[in-house]
Amino acid sequence: MKDSIDFGSMNISTLFRKLLIPTVLGMVFSALFVITDGIFVGKGIGSDALAAVNITAPLFMIAAGIGLMFGVGASVVASIHLSQGKRKVASINITQAIAFSALLILILSALCLYFIEPLARLLGSSDRLLPLAVEYMAWYIPFLVFYEVLNIGMFCIRLDGSPTYAMMCNAVAAILNIILDYIFIFELGWGIMGAAFATSLGTVVGGLMTLIYLLRFSRTLHLCRIKLSIKSLLLTLRNIGYIIKLGSSAFISEASIACMMFLGNYVFIRHLGEDGVAAFSIACYFFPIIFMVYNAIAQSAQPIISYNFGAGQPERVRKTLHLAIRTALICGISFFILTVLCCQDIVSLFIDRSYAAFDIAVNGLPYFGVGFIFFAVNMIGIGYYQSVERGQRATIITLLRGVVFMLIGFFALPPVLGIPGIWLAVPLTELLTTFYIFGIYLKDRFIVCRR
């Protein structure tokens, strides 16, 4: 299962490619979780069900963010320890991250289920969409713990030198989700409950695959027993605090997508009603695919940057960063062109032309796609600062992008530009973030030159 990878001496381009290809493929399979639900729900149940799933989406983006936070933080810490020859410490770090995040998500899941109807209303559900939103959450929330294990396990398995197996975990989960979606929705007629249950079973299988690898097949990083003495628990909490500090910007990145969905749902339902939310939901199904590709590029660069940062090899860090930025920009431009040229085809994947939401989405997606180019630069910039233990800077960038600039976009543009302004809110957010990252980069260069 282990691939031939040496983070400290292998050619950067070769090393990056070895990590990138299976990681991107794995992320594409992860995206199938998202897009398959959208296609089957839209085609098999209707636009109201599509809107209801989008209403609940911010909750699941938050859950994904928790997994990314612990995954990124633990991976950075473990990478640096591995570069210093501390294998046992690295294994303890990843075990603590998985155990603590699983406990946290179980507690949050119980609270969400207890307050499920008020939660659906808080997320913006109308009376018409409420029964569908509640039903979807009721069949997905109980299984979120496996989604967390799958998310964190991906980082650990790639760091262990097995990106291909990490890809397979996502692939098996996604393929199972597709098969079960078709059976539950079209053959058994289980409706939105079937869509939620299919996704849940897929994540259960993927999560178990990661646990089996870390328990039985890993060669460097192993799950180990956590001591329950007071001293050990205090050390665990200290380590968890540092992991959260390093990975918090990853959580905020995911939470910013949740914020985008929440604000977008709120603004669209005010201006265009449920049809507007259904149209926006198509963009929200498409956006995570873009996010996952950029995230795959950032995640492929992360262990290389972290390892060589810990080993004191700045030139290898610089080469990896530049390669990641070039790769992300090529993808961003390609995604934008694809969105403009294939807009109607993308929308028709989810809903028929007979729905009013179809024309709203076709007219709006090209505006929305402008942001994909700037989003590419932003993801790599945030990932770089995480990888070199500058978590505070990464967190500030992510907060500006996910909250401050997003609020400016959604509430400043619509009064001026009307409906196109709603679609352009996210691109404006990404553009402002790119300007900020470029500004601090120039500031850092100026300080270095003065020295």
PLM features per residue range, with description:
Residues 32-50, 120-127, 183-190, 251, ...:
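Helix-terminus/linker motif at the lipid-water interface of multi-pass membrane proteins
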